[in-house]
Every structure is written in structure tokens, then in C-alpha cells.
Amino acid sequence: MLVLPGAATTDRRLNVTSNLASSSGTKEADALRIPNAVRATVDPVLEWIDGFCTEHLDDEYARLSAKMAAKLARKRPSPLLRGDGRIWAASIVYTVGQVNFLNDPSLTPHLTTDQFSAASGVPKSTLANKARLIRDTLNTGQFDPDFCRRDLLARNPMAWMIEVNGLVVDARMLPPELQAEARRRGLIPDLDALG
């Protein structure tokens, strides 16, 4: 937990473009803070992610998947440098889907694992193995605020928990000025900024 009053914090979120298709590869990579050393490898991964999400999912999945790809690209050494870029791209989107319950038919968009595998052309076992590697590498899981869709983030109670004077509280119950400060420090989601 991060302490609200007087504590130095780091921003957990990236400022990425909401529509990847409207950006050039270089601008997109700059916005995502992708190191130059891996840019040539990551650009095709981002293109695949954008195409797949445009055809089968939505812009929000594309944005979150690009954010996850960028985070993997910044790891030393980047796991994206080993293996097939198409498999990495599909596995990244699949992992973001796991964080956001993509296989839940009550949510939109929705794809079962079989549908995802068929659409991506990557076997289910490969998707599952790479997704586990990605989750372990990034220490992520379901409802992770960094990769959670806006509609799920609003309902995720853990995204709103912060420590104030040693007491863990739901930030939505704080006075507006403290909520604004928590948002400014990146301690709680800024749903307006997410679109």
C-alpha cells in the first residue's frame, strides 16, 4: 500500500494513445516508451495486436495489450527478443483477456479460448504457456489495475484501496480534494482520463 499524505510515489500508468491505428510505428513506440534496442522486434508485435484487436475485440483491448507489450519490451533482457513475434502478440492479447475475463459470455467483447486460438492461429497450449510466463514476468493477474478495462476497473474494489494515516480506506469515500490528490499521484484510477 502507498501512503497518500506526503509520500513520494511512482505513476503506475502510461500515457498511450487510445487508437493505435492512428499512430505511426515510431510515434506509437515513443508514446509507449519502448527502448530503441527492441523497437524493431516490438513494432511487428504491436501491428499484429492492433490488427487482431480491431478485427476481433476493440480499441481498449488494443491499448491495454500495447501497454503490456511495452512493459515486456522494457524488461532486461526482454522476453520478446526470443521466439515468434506472432505468438508473443497473441499471448499478450490473451493475457490481457485473462485479466479482463474475455471468456465470460456476459461481457462484451467476448471470445472463448477455442475462438481466440482459432482467430489467432496459435494453439491453446502455446497461448496458456506464454500467458503464464507473461503473468509471472509482470506479476499480473485478474483485475490488475494496470491492465484492467475501464468498465471492470470501476467495479474493482482493490483498485480503490489506499492507505491514509496508517488506515486502509476506499478512496471513493474520501473527500473530493483527497481523491484528486490520489488520482494525481496515480494511486487510484482516473476513469475520466481512461476515456
Predicted regions mapped to residue ranges:
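Basic, alpha-helical nucleic-acid-binding regions used in initiation and control of genome expression
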Residues: 2-6, 15-87, 97-195
